[in-house]
Every structure is written in C-alpha cells, then in structure tokens.
C-alpha cells in the first residue's frame, strides 16, 4: 500500500528497535502511516548510520537483531502503522574483519566465488586490490605489521593471508597476497575498486549480477514477504551500473511494493519515466518549497552585499557557475583521479582493439574524459551500451559541450578524442563487454563528480544565502515563483502521485527550520549586511577569512533559538566541516591546523558565544524577524504536508527542529518536550491525510487557486480534490513593508462552506467565492480549510 505519510527514524546503538517501539504510540497518534527506518542490516560495529553494511543476511545485532525488528513491526501494526526500510544496494563497508565476503575475496583473489560481488579492476593492480589503510608509506609502517596465524594485523585492522604464505618473510609475504596494503593517500590516484563517491571505506557492489542481487536482497525480500516491511527507500541509485534494470528487478521481486529512490534531480530534470518506482525521496520538492519562501530580488541584492563583504574571486565563491566549474576540475583531477585513470584504461583498450579508433593517445583520452565530465549538467546520463541513446541522454553531452571540451587541445586532430569519448559514453560504439563497462563507469563517475563538486564543495564556497545550498538546490537561482511551484506540483500529481517529499533528512546540511530563518534574510539584505558589520566590530577575535565569517553569522542567526549552552559545541564542528569541504584554506586530506584553530577561536568568541554582545545583537535581530520566520516555518510545513506526494517527516521535525550538518542532525530521536504551533499544524494535516486518502492519495487532484489584488504574489493557495484548501503567506516581511494585504482576495472553490481546521475559534468558516486575505490570515499566516461535509 502507498503510505499517507512516513516518519524517518535514525536507528543506532543508542536508539535501537526497542527504543523505536516505545515511540510507536506517540507516532501513531501524530498521524503518520509508516515508520521510515534507516538501514538495519548488519553494519560495522558502532556505526551511527548503518550505511556501512557488512552482512546482508542478518539484521543488525546492535539494534536488537531480527527479533527486535519483528517486535517493532508487530507493535507498529497494533497501532495501525507499517514499516518502510532504507536499503543500500550500491556499496558495503571495506572492512575485511567484519565483511566476510570481502575477507574471502582478499584471501582467494579473483578466483573467489565472491569476487563478482565487488567492483574491482584486478588487471590495474597486477592481480592485487589496493587497500589504502596505512597511516604512512609502507616502509614507515612495516614495524606495525604482524603475522598472527593466518591473519595479518595492522593496529586494530585484520587481513586474511593467502593459503601457504603465513611462514614467508614479511616483504615476500606482502608481495604474495591478493591485496596490497598502501598509504591512505594512494586512494586518490591508485585505487582499483569502485567506491562510494570518494570514500575508500565503502566498496562498490555489483548488484547488476543476478546472483549478487539475490544474495544481497534475500533478507529484505523475506521481511517483505513476511509482512515485516511494506516499502523501500533505495539509497544512491546513481552509483549503480544500470539503475533502471536494478529497479525493474527489484520491483518484480517485491511484487510492486511502494519504493522511492534517492535520486537528486538537477534544474528541470525529470525522473526517468521507465523507472519502476513510486518516485524520488523528495529533494526535488524540497527545492521548490524552499524557493517559494526566498525573495528573488532580495537574494540578488544579498549576493552583492556578500561580494562586498567577503570579496571572493569569481571561481572561488563569487560566481556560482564559475565556482562549480573550478570545483569540478579539482575533483576530477584530484579526488577522483583514480576513477579518471580507470576510464582512460578502458577507453585506450577499446581504441587499441579497433583499427578505426586507434592512435588516440592515452593523455588525449584522459583529457577528453575530464573535459566532458566537468560539463555534464546533471548527475549522470542513463545509457545502455549498444542501444541508441535517448534524447535526454544526448542532452547530457551536447554538441556545445563537445566544442568547449575540444578548445583545450592545441592540435585539432588530437581533439577528435573528445568525439570518441562522447560516443563511448553514449553507448554508440557497440555493446561489447569493454564498451558496456566504459558506459557504466563513465556514468557512475559523473554522479560522484557532481555530488562532490557541487554538494560537497561549491555549496561551501558560494555562500551568499546558505539556506539555498541544500541537497537538490540551485544557489544560482534560489527563488521559485508561485507559478513554477504550481507547475511542479501539477506534474507530480499527474506523473508521480506517490512520490516522496521532504524538507529535512539525515543528509540535509541544515534542518528546514534553520533554512527558513536564514531564507528570511533574502527579504532584508541591507539590514543583514548592517548587522554583520556590527557583529564583526563587536567580536574580539577576527575570522580567518570573510567567507567563513559570512557563513558563521548566518548559521548563528539560523540557530538563534538553540540553547545557549549548546550553540558553540554544535556550531563549531559544523563550521569546521564547512571549511574542510570548501577546501579553500584547509581540507580533510591537507589540513591547516593553524587555520582551523583560528576558526575555532573565532567561533568561540563570536558566532558560538552563548552570551555577550554578539549574542544580544543576534537575539535582537531574531526577535524583530520572528513573525516572518513563523510565516516561513508554518508555510513550508503546511505546503509540504498537503501538496501531491507522500510527505516524509524527519525525526523531531513535527515541532521546531534546529539542526546542522551531520552528525548534528543524526542524534537519537527524542520526543518533543512541549507541543508547539508547528506540531499542532502537523498533527492536523497528518490526521486529515489519514482520514481522506482519496483526497491526498494517488487519485487525488491538485488545482492552483488564484489570488487577486496588490499583494497577490504573497499568497500561495491550492485545492486538493475539491475538498481541502491550503493557503500560505509567502515573503511576509516584504508584504508588511508594502502595506499588508489591503485589497487582496482569494477565490475559493464553490461548494463551501469551508471550515478553518487550524483556527482557535471552533466553527470558523468561509463561504465559497472570494475571501479577503486579511480575514483568511487573521489568526495565523497559514490556513487549512476543509469543505464542510467532505
């Protein structure tokens, strides 16, 4: 069955199945239909997230094992709830000690029956797989290696020994293994297994092989057959060799259970129509909802203020497109250099075997691969080697991109390598094994490149309005008009009515309520710039760079309601992560301890200081904007809960929820202490969804409603199936500055009266026809109306 609403719980050793079971009565009363569980299969011990799976055949013991999961499912069913599970088909933990399949592969090499499980280029390593686990070069670490029976130990790591090698001298023993222990820095350029993005601790799994699919999904399918689970969330489908084929096989195996995929859509990109899923996990909806509450003219002015204050070079945070392109080059040539080398080897081998393609030098192929990868505007193309590419696939590698890529070659004839690489990437040069491998690998690398260069680099460099730097977002065009939103929602209702929608997840860089606060700054850029100047003057320790200061002060304002004793300890790690991800002055792999100490000192003295002058200035500013933050928070929540799709609530977000980037947003679930206005709204909307499945479900209709009058652009409204009306105030600060609602009216559908479900006055109703916006929003900046008798 399709859920009416899901509630995401982050399971971890500190919040196992038994703790989730205790929350069931509360969550059932809240109004959701399903619990959405983070991964539950056996993971690396102590894992706080569960995406580092080590055994697909067992439910994680640290969470309570299969018995605990089945008990949770039983308790949920008793309260009318089902379970949706997040699964991870793309990768496993590269931890041999815990991952016994990988252990067998390392012991037996390519001859192991499990060798097909993992995406390893054995030829590139001379028959060995590189394990970049050493703290320094091998020569410096030999003294820390020790043989213990049939096991090789390095500190707390364990590796299997190839049969018959345990008694060899250590240097010879190392040479005889099916793996090579290497310095961790070698992962960047020498790695010969596919990984999750740039994380060598997570090794790619080849679920495109039927036997691997069956082995890795058997337990999940059993839990579905037994009624323990009702639906699935698929993590990172873009990492797979053939996402469409995988989803088709999964749909057949599950009997068509409700399934959504964590597919990040870029710009106006649409989910492939042939995918056998209900839709996405909802980041496309997040971008549209956030954009509704962002002022386009103010965002443009804020960009100017940011440039004046921080003075970033265009390609280091001053211009969005230039920043993305520079970041993409950096990632392609550094963090993903090993992936580029793998593609180059494949392309060179294909060309060497075909006289028509021969004589393209490896350097030219490598250059062509790099230049095309950085020009792909979406995460990846979807292509099957040997089959004609679709129009959408061809649009990922346009003629313009090819022309631009060729400009880096000084000899025009050598630039022909670009044409070869494009044809390989689009599957035009046949469907042989190597061609298929290149096609898949190119798409997988494109996905990793986009994620690392945009989400994990450019989002931390281009920071005029950090509420816009969110997963699936477009900081270059952060605002969304009512017309654009209605167009999106209408398309979802028509094409993907059971898709997921979200505002906050375990991966969002800031919770929805933090982003809502920060987005208000797009309505008062001049006031914000003045405040930053005051804060800068009042802080006794200078920021090590002005871009960091801009981000830090926006973050501090976004968390203004956070308890004073928590602010610093939560803000500092988030900002240190931001500067490391940005990679402008320090990074995860090339850290600058002095710079990072300066960041910590600045945060402690200013943005993270729980009292004093700066805290007072931010509190005063926040108090002045509080009514407009309220409108943003309630408006976004109500739109999310009533628009087409299946809303997913992240744990705690039914009430005010302030969280920063992980791990801050992955703390154990805690029931809100005191119900607030947002929780009342949430429970009312969820109860309505549960009561009226035909109104909000897959057969439900969506109709934009029209407002007229001088303030009409500040009112967004829509009707669901002729029975429920949502109306929200947008950009309320600009509205107030413009004189309020005045003559603005909303045209309600005929067939009233319409009862205000959020009103403190029982029986507050409106007849059909026009209603004055000032009257509609007299009690609060949002309204949820139900046609009496529906």
Labelled PLM ranges:
Residues 90, 234-240, 557:
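Conserved short loop/turn motifs at secondary-structure junctions
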Residues 1-45, 53, 57-62, 70, ...:
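Carbohydrate-interacting/catalytic domains
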Residues 45-49, 94-95:
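Short glycine-biased active-site loop of nucleotidyltransferases that positions the nucleotide triphosphate
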Residues 72-120:
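Hydrophobic or amphipathic alpha-helical targeting/insertion segments
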Residues 119-186:
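DnaQ-like (DEDDh/DEDDy) 3′-5′ exonuclease domain used for proofreading
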């Amino acid at each position: 069955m399709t859920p009416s609403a899901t509630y995401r719980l982050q399971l971890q050793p500190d919040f196992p199945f038994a703790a989730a079971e205790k929350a069931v009565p509360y969550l059932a009363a809240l109004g959701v239909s399903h619990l959405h569980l983070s991964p539950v299969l056996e993971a690396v011990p102590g894992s706080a997230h569960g995406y580092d799976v080590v055994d697909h055949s067992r439910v994680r013991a640290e969470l309570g094992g299969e018995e605990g999961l089945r008990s949770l499912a039983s308790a949920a069913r008793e309260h009318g709830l089902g379970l949706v599970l997040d699964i991870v088909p793309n990768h496993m933990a590269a931890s041999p000690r815990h991952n016994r399949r990988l252990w067998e592969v390392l012991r037996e090499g390519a001859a192991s029956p499990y060798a097909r499980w993992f995406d390893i280029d054995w030829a590139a390593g001379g028959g060995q797989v590189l394990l970049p686990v050493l703290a320094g070069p091998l020569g410096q670490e030999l003294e820390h290696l020790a043989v213990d029976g049939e096991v090789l130990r390095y500190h707390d790591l364990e590796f299997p020994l190839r049969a018959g090698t345990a008694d060899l001298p250590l240097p010879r023993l190392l040479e005889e293994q099916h793996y090579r222990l290497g310095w961790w820095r070698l992962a960047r350029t020498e790695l010969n297994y596919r990984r999750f993005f740039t994380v060598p601790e997570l090794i790619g799994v080849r679920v495109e092989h039927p036997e691997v699919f069956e082995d890795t999904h058997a337990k999940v399918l059993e839990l579905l057959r037994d009624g323990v689970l009702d639906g699935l969330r698929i993590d990172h489908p873009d990492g797979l060799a053939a996402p469409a084929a995988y989803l088709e096989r999964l749909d057949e195996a599950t009997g068509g259970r409700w399934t959504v995929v964590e597919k990040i859509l870029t710009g106006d990109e649409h989910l492939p129509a042939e995918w056998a899923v209900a839709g996405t996990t909802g980041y496309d909806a997040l971008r549209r909802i956030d954009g509704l509450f962002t002022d386009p003219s103010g965002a443009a002015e804020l960009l100017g203020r940011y440039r004046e204050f921080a003075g970033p070079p265009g390609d280091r945070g001053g211009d969005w497109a230039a920043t993305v392109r520079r970041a993409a080059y950096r990632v392609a040539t550094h963090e993903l250099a090993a992936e580029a080398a793998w593609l180059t080897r494949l392309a060179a081998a294909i060309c060497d075997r075909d006289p028509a393609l021969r004589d393209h030098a490896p350097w030219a192929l490598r250059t062509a691969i790099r230049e095309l990868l950085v020009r792909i505007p979406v995460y990846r193309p979807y292509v099957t080697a040997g089959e004609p590419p679709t129009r959408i696939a061809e649009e990922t590698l346009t003629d313009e991109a090819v022309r631009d890529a060729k400009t880096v070659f000084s000899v025009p004839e050598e630039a022909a390598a670009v044409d070869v690489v494009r044809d390989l990437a689009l599957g035009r040069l046949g469907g042989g094994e190597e061609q298929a491998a290149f096609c898949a690998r190119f798409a997988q690398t494109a996905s990793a490149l986009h994620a690392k260069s945009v989400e994990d680099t450019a989002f931390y460099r281009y920071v005029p309005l950090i509420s816009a730097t969110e997963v699936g977002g477009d900081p270059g065009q952060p605002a969304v008009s009512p017309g654009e939103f209605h167009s999106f929602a209408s398309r979802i209702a028509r094409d993907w009515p059971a898709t997921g929608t979200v505002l906050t997840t375990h991966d969002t860089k800031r919770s929805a309520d933090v982003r809502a606060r920060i987005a208000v700054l797009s309505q008062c850029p001049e006031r914000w710039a003045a405040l930053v100047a005051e804060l800068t003057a009042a802080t006794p320790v200078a920021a090590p760079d002005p871009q960091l200061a801009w981000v830090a002060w926006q973050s501090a304002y976004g968390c203004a309601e956070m308890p004073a004793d928590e602010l610093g300890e939560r803000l500092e790690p988030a900002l240190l992560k931001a500067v490391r991800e940005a990679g402008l002055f320090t990074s995860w792999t090339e850290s600058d301890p002095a710079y990072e100490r300066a960041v910590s000192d600045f945060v402690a003295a200013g943005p993270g200081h729980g009292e004093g002058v700066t805290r007072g200035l931010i509190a005063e500013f926040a108090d002045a904007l509080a009514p407009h933050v309220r409108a943003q928070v309630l408006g976004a929540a109500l739109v999310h809960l009533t628009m087409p799709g299946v809303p997913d609530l992240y744990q705690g977000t039914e009430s005010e929820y302030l969280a920063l980037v992980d791990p801050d947003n992955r703390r154990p679930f805690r029931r809100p202490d005191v119900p607030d206005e947002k929780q009342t709204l949430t429970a009312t909307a969820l109860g309505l969804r549960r009561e009226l499945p035909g109104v909000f479900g897959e057969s439900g209709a969506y109709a934009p409603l029209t407002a007229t009058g001088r303030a009409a652009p500040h009112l967004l409204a829509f009707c669901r199936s002729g029975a429920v009306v949502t109306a929200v105030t947008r950009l309320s600060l600009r509205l107030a500055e413009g004189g309020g609602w005045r003559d603005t009216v909303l045209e309600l559908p005929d067939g009233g009266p319409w009862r205000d479900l959020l009103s403190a006055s029982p029986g507050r109703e409106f007849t059909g026809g026009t209603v004055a916006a000032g009257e509609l929003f007299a009690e609060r900046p949002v309204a949820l109306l139900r046609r009496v008798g529906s």
